[in-house]
Design a protein with these regions (language model features):
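N-terminal amphipathic/basic-hydrophobic helices that include classical n-h-c signal peptides
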Residues: 1-13
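Local sequence-structure signature of Cys/Sec-based thiol-disulfide redox active-site neighborhoods
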Residues: 15-43
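Short helix-capping segments at alpha-helix termini
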Residues: 45-49
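Thiol-based oxidoreductase modules, predominantly thioredoxin-like and allied folds used
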Residues: 50-61
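Short Fe-S-cluster ligation motifs
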Residues: 59-72
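A short, hydrophobic beta-strand/beta-hairpin element that forms part of a small beta-sheet core
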Residues: 72-80
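Non-catalytic, surface beta->alpha helical segment in thiol-disulfide oxidoreductase systems
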Residues: 79-97
């Protein structure tokens, strides 16, 4: 009960899930900067606040053309936030916004 109203448990869970950020790392095999970016994100200490997806740019000609020389590229909720390196403090700030 909140303020005299009963809030179904599933609504609380749905709100929690919908407030998580969706992070995508565009990368390719053998990219050491991609490995560093992924490790930085995974070790940022806020993994409960986002879902992480890694996309190999070699699997899509358009992504390969777009990001060939700029990986890793990291997006948060569809907005490009980082190229080449991830600033951990800025990443954490963006996840908590």
């Amino acid at each position: 009960m909140v303020g005299g109203l009963f809030i179904p448990f599933f609504l609380i869970i749905m709100q929690e899930v919908s407030s998580r950020r969706h992070v995508i790392i565009y990368s390719r095999p053998g990219c050491h900067l991609c490995d560093e970016a992924k490790a930085t994100i995974q070790n940022a200490g806020c993994s409960d606040r986002f879902s992480l997806e890694e996309i190999n740019i070699e699997s899509d000609d358009e992504l390969l053309r777009k990001y060939k020389y700029d990986i890793p590229v990291v997006t948060i909720d569809g907005v490009e936030r980082f190229r080449h390196r991830v600033n951990v403090a800025e990443f954490i700030r963006l996840i908590h916004v």
